[in-house]
């Protein structure tokens, strides 16, 4: 069985059970999948309120949210997890993907006289409908510190994904009955199936929140809080038709062959009108799967799937 086909089978097993992806970690800090900072003072809170599209003042102790970081043009430059740790009103952890973001954060922090802490920590992602901890089932949107034989692990759950952080040894040789150990492709596929493509692939295109179902990650409630990119984002969301995320699989044979020559997926109506493009493609079992952001009025079950550069079109199955 090829590695790609094996990834698809692993993703399918984890989708009906649970899976763990241990993220790459570079000791030099240059090629890690995630980077982490913490703030623990009033200046740090002000810094995050300027930087993030969610408002940390509305994240209570022990809660976690996801957020965009935008540039001045309103384009998404990163997608982050923001956890309000239980021990303090001003203690927040921010987990993001781009090393460029870290460099930019240092520049923005100077304006707030803020000296945040960069953490060296290992990260894993648990995919499961329910997250069991030594303290019982973990609620959605919550943070929990777990004490294990390999040190403390911080768990941050959003939907079917739980971000775990701890010492490197915490994830070494980790096994659990019924848990699939995921490779990168199977982990990405599960992100797409959970409608969270931005957890891995926000950098695939120049996107604005209005291009995706981005309203869930933006807090406009405080009119005086001018986060970077706010004005353009607010105007675009008001002017454009709301989008919904749909997970589709195509009725095409030999789906794994797509990965030999990846291309953008184009989704069309039955009349041949393009409604969306998607670069967020994975393999679930033997089915080529994608998540796309289409207008709310779209009948997803009638969409036609085309791979960029091909003339063949395929019917779709709506997974969610």
Report each predicted region and the residues it spans:
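Acidic, proline/glycine-enriched N-terminal capping motif
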Residues: 1-70, 74-75
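Conserved, structured C-terminal
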Residues: 2-27, 31-33, 83-320
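Long, hydrophobic/aromatic-enriched structural stretches that serve as scaffold segments
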Residues: 72-88
């Amino acid at each position: 069985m090829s590695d790609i086909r094996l990834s698809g089978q692993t993703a399918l097993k984890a989708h009906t059970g649970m899976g763990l992806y241990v993220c790459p970690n570079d000791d030099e800090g240059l090629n890690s999948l995630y980077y982490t900072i913490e703030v623990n003072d009033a200046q740090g809170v002000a810094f995050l309120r300027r930087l993030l599209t969610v408002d940390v003042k509305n994240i209570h102790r022990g809660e976690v949210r996801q957020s965009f970081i935008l540039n001045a043009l309103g384009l998404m430059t990163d997608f982050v997890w923001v956890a309000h740790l239980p021990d303090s009103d001003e203690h927040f952890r921010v987990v993001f993907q781009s090393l460029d973001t870290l460099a930019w954060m240092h520049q923005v922090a100077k304006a707030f006289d803020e000296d945040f802490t960069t953490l060296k920590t290992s990260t894993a992602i648990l995919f499961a409908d329910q997250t069991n901890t030594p303290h019982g089932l973990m609620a959605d949107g919550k943070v929990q510190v777990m004490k294990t034989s390999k040190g403390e692990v911080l768990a941050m759950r959003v939907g079917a994904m739980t971000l775990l952080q701890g010492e490197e040894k915490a994830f070494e040789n980790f096994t659990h009955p019924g848990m699939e150990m995921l490779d990168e492709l199977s982990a990405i596929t599960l992100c797409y199936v959970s409608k969270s493509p931005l957890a891995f692939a926000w950098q695939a295109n120049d996107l604005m929140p209005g291009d995706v179902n981005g309203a869930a990650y933006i807090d406009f409630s405080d009119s005086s809080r001018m986060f970077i990119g706010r004005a353009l984002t607010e105007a675009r969301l008001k002017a454009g038709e709301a989008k919904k995320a749909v997970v589709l699989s195509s009725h095409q044979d030999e789906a794994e062959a797509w990965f030999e020559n990846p291309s953008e997926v184009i989704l069309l109506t039955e009349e041949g009108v393009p409604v969306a493009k998607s670069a967020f493609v994975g393999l679930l079992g033997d089915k080529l799967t994608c998540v796309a952001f289409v207008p709310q009025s779209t009948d997803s079950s009638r969409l036609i799937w085309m791979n960029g550069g091909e003339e063949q079109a395929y019917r779709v199955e709506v997974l969610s």
